[in-house]
């Protein structure tokens, strides 16, 4: 019988990522875990609908037994079974992030007995979670280099706080893992500005694009008008394609916040990324930790290791025989993964 891993949900940044990573790793390794103090660092601690959906999805996919799976719960015991591929559908029932639920269960399906399709309904454009276009255009090309083949499709947008969006991912079992080396970003090839509108006047998008164009040489710019019933909502994104990596940054518009202020937030974030030669942005770094750990080797550079990143690394090291080493040189942190030997 495998040992029970005890996790403190209050460690590090004390958010939901500790739970999501633990669920993924438990399904993959077969190791059960207990987590207490779930989301202790948040204003509203405990399981929200999004986190509960992730728990229920993980439970269904690996036929786990679970204790504490209810709204507001701050303690969970998860004992995984065998991961099985198939066609799965999960509904969050709020504007909670579809991509964060997918992020929880897809790694386990890389080890399933056959191909799978997972469809999640909820929020697609959420200020605190990566949108589907980030997964599709930034993360999945890097996963393919590691040997992980999955394809995400956004079927319907759902903006915070209403939700109603749908995202689906098709995934195949991994035959073998490759190592990923992301040392330098390289020269910028082109930059693309993109705005989504649903039930919002077009001039909002035009002003957002103008603000981006005032700071960066946009090679391409797009305005997408979505059906009104998918809103109201507005997201502005900027994609930076460099020689060795493509990064994408976004800001979700808010009521009573001007188009110029929304776009200026994005400009600030992109400038922070470009100020360093590091290849990987803050949010992508979080997404790379688990797949690169499963490969057992690799490295990437990031300007500043976030508390979120360090917390995620700590959880991964509890489940997998790997060690992460962080080395800072000239304002760039190199994150290196090595496999531990018995």
Swiss-Prot record:
Gene3D superfamilies: RNA 3'-terminal phosphate cyclase domain, RNA 3'-terminal phosphate cyclase, insert domain. It is found in: Cytoplasm. It catalyses: a 3'-end 3'-phospho-ribonucleotide-RNA + ATP = a 3'-end 2',3'-cyclophospho-ribonucleotide-RNA + AMP + diphosphate. The active site is at residue 308. ATP binds at residues 103, 283-287. GO terms for biological process: RNA processing. One of its GO terms (molecular function) is RNA-3'-phosphate cyclase activity. It is an enzyme of class 6 (ligase). SUPFAM superfamilies: EPT/RTPC-like, RNA 3'-terminal phosphate cyclase, RPTC, insert domain. Its EC number is 6.5.1.4. Pfam families: RTC, RTC_insert. Keywords: ATP-binding, Cytoplasm, Ligase, Nucleotide-binding. One of its GO terms (cellular component) is cytoplasm. Its main location: cytoplasm. Catalyzes the conversion of 3'-phosphate to a 2',3'-cyclic phosphodiester at the end of RNA. The mechanism of action of the enzyme occurs in 3 steps: (A) adenylation of the enzyme by ATP; (B) transfer of adenylate to an RNA-N3'P to produce RNA-N3'PP5'A; (C) and attack of the adjacent 2'-hydroxyl on the 3'-phosphorus in the diester linkage to produce the cyclic end product. The biological role of this enzyme is unknown but it is likely to function in some aspects of cellular RNA processing. Belongs to the RNA 3'-terminal cyclase family. Type 1 subfamily. HAMAP family: RTC. This is RNA 3'-terminal phosphate cyclase. It comes from Shigella dysenteriae serotype 1 (strain Sd197). The lineage of its organism: Bacteria, Pseudomonadati, Pseudomonadota, Gammaproteobacteria, Enterobacterales.
């Amino acid at each position: 019988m495998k040992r029970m891993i005890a996790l403190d949900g209050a460690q590090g940044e004390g958010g939901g990522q500790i739970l999501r990573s633990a669920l993924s790793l438990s399904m993959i390794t077969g190791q059960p875990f207990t987590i207490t103090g779930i989301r202790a660092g948040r204003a509203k601690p405990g399981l929200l609908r999004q986190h509960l959906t992730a728990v229920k999805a993980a439970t269904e996919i690996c036929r786990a037994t679970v204790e504490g799976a209810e709204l507001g719960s701050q303690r969970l015991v998860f004992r995984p079974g065998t991961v099985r591929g198939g066609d799965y559908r999960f509904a969050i029932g709020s504007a909670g992030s579809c991509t964060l639920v997918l992020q929880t269960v897809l790694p386990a399906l890389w080890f399933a007995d056959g191909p799978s399709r997972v469809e999640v309904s909820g929020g697609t454009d959420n200020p605190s979670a990566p949108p589907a276009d980030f997964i599709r255009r930034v993360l999945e090309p890097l996963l393919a280099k590691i040997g992980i083949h999955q394809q995400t499709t956004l079927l319907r947008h759902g903006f915070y706080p209403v939700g109603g969006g749908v995202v689906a991912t098709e995934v195949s079992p991994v035959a073998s893992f490759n190592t990923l080396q992301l040392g330098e970003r390289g020269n910028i090839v082109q930059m693309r500005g993109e705005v989504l509108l649903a039930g919002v006047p077009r001039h909002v998008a035009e002003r957002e694009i103008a603000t981006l164009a005032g700071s960066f040489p946009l090679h391409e710019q797009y305005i997408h008008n979505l059906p009104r019933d998918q809103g109201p909502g507005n997201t502005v994104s900027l994609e930076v394609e460099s020689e060795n990596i493509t990064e994408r940054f976004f800001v979700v518009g808010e009521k009573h916040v001007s188009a110029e202020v929304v776009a200026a937030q994005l400009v600030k974030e992109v400038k922070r990324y470009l100020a360093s030669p590091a290849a990987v942005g803050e949010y992508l770094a979080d997404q790379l930790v688990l797949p690169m750990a499963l490969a057992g080797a690799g490295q990437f550079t990031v300007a500043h290791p976030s508390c979120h990143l360090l917390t995620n690394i700590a959880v991964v090291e509890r489940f997998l025989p790997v060690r992460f080493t962080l080395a800072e040189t000239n304002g760039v942190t190199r994150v290196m993964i090595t496999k531990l030997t018995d």
